[in-house]
């Protein structure tokens, strides 16, 4: 049976493409590798930032996105324990190979002035949590057992 072998990219809506690219490039070290007009979407912009392991983090901005309100508990969870509507993203977790890299990411993120919680040991993984621009709840995790 053929099935996917992983995630190529996840696309997050943004009202401020420049701010998001700067955050993920500077804070997480993910370089911008492509930015282009969205095919068949007038005024739409699609950007790709590369992560280790052959996957990408993607940002999408449409002309009306900046005017769409962020509503915690509906459009965004706001925290790792927060609620949001069915079909929305509760949080985005990035992967690192081990606890040493997790601690290095925590320290790097903190040097950028971002508050980081953790690491927390969940048994199957260890994680740190922090907030990105536009109320995105972010996590970096490594194997725990």
What spans do the regions from the language model cover?
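N-terminal beta-strand motif that seeds the catalytic metal site of vicinal oxygen chelate
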Residues: 1-19, 89-94
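Amphipathic alpha-helical "stalk" segments
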Residues: 1-2, 39-47, 53-54, 72, ...
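Core segments of cupin and vicinal oxygen chelate
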Residues: 13-64
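Vicinal oxygen chelate
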Residues: 50, 103-145
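Helix-adjacent hinge/juxtasegments
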Residues: 66-95
């Amino acid at each position: 049976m053929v099935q996917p072998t992983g995630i190529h990219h996840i696309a997050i809506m943004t009202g401020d493409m420049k701010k998001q690219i700067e955050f993920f490039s500077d804070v997480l070290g993910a370089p911008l590798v492509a930015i282009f007009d969205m095919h068949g979407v007038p005024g739409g912009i699609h950007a790709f930032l590369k992560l280790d392991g052959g996957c990408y983090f993607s940002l999408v901005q449409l002309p009306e996105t900046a005017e769409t309100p962020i509503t915690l508990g509906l459009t965004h969870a706001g925290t790792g324990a927060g609620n949001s509507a069915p079909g929305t993203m509760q949080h985005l977790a990035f992967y690192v190979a081990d606890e040493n890299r997790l601690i290095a990411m925590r320290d790097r993120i903190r040097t950028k002035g971002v508050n980081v919680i953790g690491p927390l040991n969940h048994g199957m993984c260890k994680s740190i949590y922090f907030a990105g621009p536009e109320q995105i709840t972010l996590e970096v995790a490594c194997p725990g057992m």
